[in-house]
């Protein structure tokens, strides 16, 4: 049986507030300064009744808040004032709340206890164990017969790549700073026997809007905890573009799958493109099985050899040959940071690639909605967003993949 996640997706435009799950107490004032109009709807541009359109966004938002407030357990609403709906998933909703006494802002994830059982049990079990500077913190949990309410810190800095697009510059030095934080958190998790299994840019959030903000690892719905030294995982789960070859090959696997994902993230971080990219799942998975990627393109000429070496030591088919989190932190590219990492501004290329993929993905989605034909599997490498909230690895598609003769040959070559 495959893992399924209630990955959160943005509800819609709401200022510059991203779907976020982390925050820390001392940032409350900064949060309020950054979001002074969080609960205000747009002004009515005209009072002419004939120009009246749909209710203002603020009114719709208030109705949604009331709708979800009514669904919350009284114990929760007695302690927390629900302010806004900020995200939703397959079996979950996330709201921004304020502690009624301290006025601290938090996020509460409300999960359907039956449909989201696998997700909440995994996430709660992990978050109750961890306490790390670069990992989301669970504050408390309320449970009823039908629902689970997870109270978590709230981050206000947005997703990793949103910040890069908005930032005026981005260098390898900036990339190594981000990766040092991510790897420090991953090393901590692996030391506890915890494998995240869904590391990707959407799950790396900035702590606050400031330029010196740290990165936080979030969303542990697919995570797994090792029961013993030889305890392997076998569940087919993850996000297609970030999944490791051993999962596709249906081999027993361990925490090295997270390091493969870090390699994919690093590649994207330095180029704004994915190392393995194809709309057709079979072709995509075959690229991953062979670790078939390249540094083609003008933008890669500006990336140092050390950075490419770092990626090459992570995107290795054999898990045993992949860098561990501890070893990755010792790689010369990360250690030297300012000394050896290139200071060339990569921002223009990266942001253009990210924006292009996001805009073409949006246009592609609109086109798909206007036609009944959904059977085409033609590759569309330039038209796919880096966001992957609804793209999950499904066990049945891996079953079908293994019936393909070409894939069988690829698997045989892996041994």
From Swiss-Prot:
Classification via CDD domains: STKc_PSKH1
Region annotated Disordered, chain positions: 1-70, 353-415
Database matches in InterPro entries: Kinase-like_dom_sf, Prot_kinase_dom, Protein_kinase_ATP_BS, Ser/Thr_kinase_AS
Compositional bias annotation for Low complexity: 363-385
Polar residues bias locations: 353-362
MF terms in GO: ATP binding; protein serine kinase activity; protein serine/threonine kinase activity
Keywords: ATP-binding, Kinase, Nucleotide-binding, Serine/threonine-protein kinase, Transferase
EC number: 2.7.11.1
Compositional bias segments (type: Basic and acidic residues): 41-50, 386-406
SUPFAM superfamilies according to UniProt: Protein kinase-like (PK-like)
Catalytic activity from the UniProt record: L-seryl-[protein] + ATP = O-phospho-L-seryl-[protein] + ADP + H(+); L-threonyl-[protein] + ATP = O-phospho-L-threonyl-[protein] + ADP + H(+)
Every Protein kinase domain range: 80-334
Keyword Kinase found: yes
Binding site for ATP: 86-94, 109
Residue positions of the active site: 198
Domain of life: Eukaryota
Signal peptide: none
Family designation: Belongs to the protein kinase superfamily. CAMK Ser/Thr protein kinase family.
Record-given protein name: Serine/threonine-protein kinase H1 homolog
Organism: Pinctada fucata
